[in-house]
């Protein structure tokens, strides 16, 4: 057993990645703790090679917080799945004198008030939580091997991915690079040439 990787190891890692012999990357695991809005969690959970454990609203009184953007992206002109991060707006819908960010914040407040009112009236948490919006933050653990983490990062840092999950993938990439700098940098270098 040796502790440090040498030049020969680096060449082998690059060779394995270049030729897609990635089973060796399936024995390196990492567990993350995430705190993201429900809609980001839903996208993340599409990656079924991860193992997840989410904090449940049925069993906890953890403070409820919401993702409240101060500006909104416009719809991408040609990609229906994407938004335009270059053009940020805070529009006033036709029925309001205030901007969208203020309306969203007020909506969150009303939802939380209704949720707490239902709980206080004796409604069980599993039903009361149905009034909470998709912008509510949730916390969960996600465990994944390095091979599938790199695939997740590839897919979710793509410009067509939703901005919020791009930020999540970028944070995962930063941690993965700290843990496995040679492997992650080799993977990114080889993928960038394609």
Give the ranges of each region predicted by the language model:
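Family-specific signature for flavin-dependent thymidylate synthase
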Residues: 1-194
């Amino acid at each position: 057993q040796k502790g440090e990787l040498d030049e020969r190891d680096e060449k082998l890692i690059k060779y394995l990645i270049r030729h897609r012999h990635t089973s060796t990357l399936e024995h390196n695991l990492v567990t993350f703790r995430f705190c993201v809005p429900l809609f980001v969690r839903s996208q993340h959970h599409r990656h079924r090679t991860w193992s997840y454990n989410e904090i449940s609203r049925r069993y906890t009184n953890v403070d409820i917080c919401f993702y409240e953007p101060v500006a909104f992206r416009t719809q991408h002109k040609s990609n229906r799945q994407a938004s335009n991060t270059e053009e940020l707006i805070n529009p006033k819908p036709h029925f309001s004198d205030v901007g969208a960010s203020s309306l969203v914040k007020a909506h969150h407040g009303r939802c939380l008030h209704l949720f707490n009112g239902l709980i206080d009236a004796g409604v069980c948490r599993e039903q009361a939580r149905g009034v909470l919006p998709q912008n509510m933050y949730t916390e969960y653990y996600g465990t994944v091997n390095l091979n599938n983490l790199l695939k997740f990062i590839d897919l979710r840092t793509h410009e067509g991915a939703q901005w919020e999950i791009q930020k999540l993938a970028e944070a995962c990439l930063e941690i993965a690079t700290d843990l496995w700098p040679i492997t992650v940098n080799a993977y990114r270098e080889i993928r960038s040439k394609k």
